[in-house]
A protein has these predicted regions:
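Active-site beta-loop-alpha junctions enriched in small/polar residues
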Residues: 16-18, 51, 78, 101, ...
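Alpha-helix-loop-beta-strand connector modules within alpha/beta enzyme cores
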Residues: 1-9, 55-78, 100-101, 107-125, ...
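Catalytic cores of alpha/beta
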Residues: 80-92, 127-138, 175, 179-198
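Conserved, mostly hydrophobic/aromatic
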Residues: 13, 38, 46, 88, ...
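Active-site mouth loops of central-metabolism enzymes
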Residues: 12-30, 71-80, 121-126, 174-179
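Glycine-rich phosphate-binding active-site loops on the catalytic face of alpha/beta enzymes
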Residues: 87-107, 144-153, 191-232
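Glycine-rich active-site/cofactor-binding loop and its immediate structural neighborhood
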Residues: 19-76
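Glycine-enriched alpha-helix->loop->beta-strand junction motifs that scaffold or abut catalytic
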Residues: 42-43, 68-71, 90-96, 116-120, ...
Length: 237
């Protein structure tokens, strides 16, 4: 929670081999190099997919990255049992993903209580106003708004703007999906996002830029560095 609750914009940078919207993203998947480069770039949190069917993730990949970096880590999976929360803690996760579309308010509150007992933070993902209300009622402290339409995979940042006022000021507001440029980050910052979740790399690139961590002292420089990542990956498509 503290990793993304700080002045300015926080960055949650993702390590994943595939996604439902893009298929296989990285045939050559140097996940340890990617994670280390995110850490060197000053990422506030590293997100790692462990879901095997749609994202081609694994618990072993998460564990290897956990052993290689000290940056806080988010385990992203379809969490549907409290067993997975205990498992995540044993794997070294600092945060887990809870998806409102999969959990009613009662179940979400129960899972959040288990997270509190285990010392885990939880990113509660929402897509619409009803899901945000459920997240708030359950006591979520980190609320993500996914700007991707899960029916056609299009991205609409106006969704983040429409829903912003429903998120309590004391909660961390994370904008998810489709962030492709510093202009996107600036737009999300202007509507009050506290953090962005960026699902790079989005090509089969085997190398990642490693900017100097000292460059990340302020938000403008931080966004410029992230734009370097985007430019390089776009050139390789």
């Amino acid at each position: 929670f503290q990793a993304v609750k700080r002045p300015g914009m926080s960055f949650i940078c993702e390590v994943k081999k595939a996604s439902p919207s893009k298929g296989v993203i990285a045939r050559d998947f140097p996940y340890l190099d990617i994670a280390r480069d995110y850490e060197a770039a000053g990422a506030d949190c590293i997100s790692c997919l462990t879901e095997p069917k749609w994202f081609l993730g694994s618990d072993d990949i998460f564990r290897e990255i956990r052993a290689a970096v000290s940056t806080p880590m988010l385990r992203k999976d379809f969490t549907v049992s409290d067993y997975q929360l205990y498992q995540s803690r044993l794997m070294g996760a600092d945060c887990v993903l809870l998806i409102c579309a999969l959990l009613d308010t009662k179940a979400l509150a129960q899972y959040l209580a288990v997270c509190d007992e285990l010392g885990l933070s939880a990113l509660v993902e929402t897509h619409d106003a009803d899901e945000i209300r459920s997240a708030v009622a359950a006591g979520a402290k980190i609320i993500g708004v996914n700007n991707r339409n899960l029916k056609d995979f299009s991205v609409d940042f106006s969704n983040a703007a429409r829903l912003r006022d429903l998120i309590p000021p004391e909660a961390v507001y994370v904008a998810e999906s489709g962030v492709q440029s510093t202009q996107d980050v600036a737009a999300l910052r202007s509507i009050g996002a506290d953090a962005v979740l960026i699902g790079w790399p989005e090509t089969d690139a085997s190398d990642v830029i490693t900017p100097d961590a000292a460059q990340l002292d302020d938000i403008d420089e931080q966004m410029r560095v992230m734009e370097q990542h985007i430019a390089k990956f776009s050139a390789m498509e």
